[in-house]
Swiss-Prot record:
Gene Ontology BP terms: rRNA catabolic process; rRNA processing; tRNA processing
Protein name: Ribonuclease PH
CDD domains on file: RNase_PH_bact
List of residues binding phosphate: 96, 134-136
The protein's Enzyme Commission number: 2.7.7.56
Function: Phosphorolytic 3'-5' exoribonuclease that plays an important role in tRNA 3'-end maturation. Removes nucleotide residues following the 3'-CCA terminus of tRNAs; can also add nucleotides to the ends of RNA molecules by using nucleoside diphosphates as substrates, but this may not be physiologically important. Probably plays a role in initiation of 16S rRNA degradation (leading to ribosome degradation) during starvation.
KW Metal-binding (keyword) present: no
An MF annotation (GO) of this entry: 3'-5'-RNA exonuclease activity
Length: 247
C-alpha cells in the first residue's frame, strides 16, 4: 500500500496552494542583439536567457550533417542575499554551474531534430539576475523561448528550411516540506525541504530528466510518485504559459 502524504489546505507564501506554481512572466526579445532571448520570472527568481546562432558545429559533429545545442549558466554576483565573486575572477567554473549548464543543454537537445538544424550550433547563455529558488528550472523554461525565437530567426534568414524543434520543454521543482508536498519551491521552502526534486518534461508529457535528493531524510516511493504527478501538472501549466508567450 502506497504511503499517502498529508496534503492540507494550508496556504504558503503569497497565499499559494500546495499545487500552485509561482506567478510566471516571460518577456521575449529582451536582448535586442541576440537571435533569441527571454527574460523569465518565477516569482522573485529572474533569469535572462539568450540564444546565439552560429554556423558550424563542434569537431566531433563535423561531417555528420547535424547540429548542436549547448548552454552556459551563471549567477550574477549579487543575485542572492550576499555578494559572491564572479567565477571568471575565481578562475574556475563551479561544479554546480557546470552541472546546470549541461542540464539545460540536454533539455533543449531532447526536443531537437538535429538534422533539421543542419551543421549549425546554438549557444544558450542563462544568467541569473535574482535568485529565490528554482533558478535551473526557470532557466530551462526560459531557454525554450529563446531557442524557439532563434530558430525562427534562422528560418526567416533562409539558413534553415524548417523549424527543428519537435516539442516544447519546461522544468519545475517539487519538494517535501514538513508533511506536505509543495510545487515550485522558493528559496525559503527549498532551504527547509526534507527532499526536493527538479523534473524536466516535454510539452507532450514525456520525461526528460529527474534530479532528486533526500536532503534531510529519506522519502517513500509513494511520496515520489506524488511528487512526479505534481511536477507533471506544473509543467503542463508552464507549457500553456510558454505557448501564450509565443502566440
Amino acid at each position: 500500500m502506497l504511503f499517502c502524504c498529508i496534503i492540507c489546505s494550508v496556504l504558503r507564501k503569497n497565499s499559494r496552494a500546495h499545487d500552485e506554481i509561482r506567478p510566471v512572466k516571460i518577456i521575449r526579445g529582451w536582448n535586442i542583439y541576440a537571435e533569441g532571448s527571454a527574460l523569465i520570472a518565477f516569482g522573485n527568481t529572474r533569469v535572462l536567457c539568450n540564444a546565439t546562432f552560429q554556423r558550424g558545429v563542434p569537431p566531433f559533429l563535423r561531417g555528420q550533417r547535424s547540429g548542436w545545442i549547448t548552454a552556459e549558466y551563471a549567477m550574477l554576483p549579487r543575485s542572492g542575499t550576499e555578494r559572491s565573486d564572479r567565477e571568471s575572477v575565481k578562475g574556475k567554473i563551479s561544479g554546480r554551474s557546470h552541472e546546470i549548464s549541461r542540464l539545460i543543454g540536454r533539455s533543449m537537445r531532447a526536443i531537437l531534430d538535429r538534422y533539421a538544424l543542419e551543421e549549425n550550433t546554438i549557444i544558450l547563455d542563462c544568467d541569473v539576475l535574482q535568485a529565490d529558488g528554482g533558478t535551473r528550472t526557470a532557466a530551462i523554461t526560459g531557454s525554450y523561448i529563446a531557442l524557439y525565437d532563434a530558430l525562427v530567426w534562422a528560418k526567416n534568414q533562409k539558413i534553415l528550411s524548417k523549424h527543428p524543434l519537435t516539442d516544447s520543454v519546461s522544468a519545475v521543482s517539487v519538494g517535501l516540506v514538513g508533511d506536505q508536498i509543495f510545487l515550485d519551491l522558493d528559496y525559503s521552502e527549498d532551504s527547509n525541504a526534507q527532499a526536493d526534486i527538479n523534473l524536466v518534461f516535454t510539452g507532450s508529457g514525456k520525461l526528460v530528466e529527474i534530479q532528486g535528493t533526500a536532503e534531510k531524510s529519506p522519502f517513500s516511493y509513494g511520496q515520489f510518485e506524488q511528487m512526479m504527478e505534481l511536477a507533471k501538472t506544473g509543467c503542463q501549466a508552464l507549457k500553456e504559459i510558454q505557448a501564450a508567450s509565443l502566440d
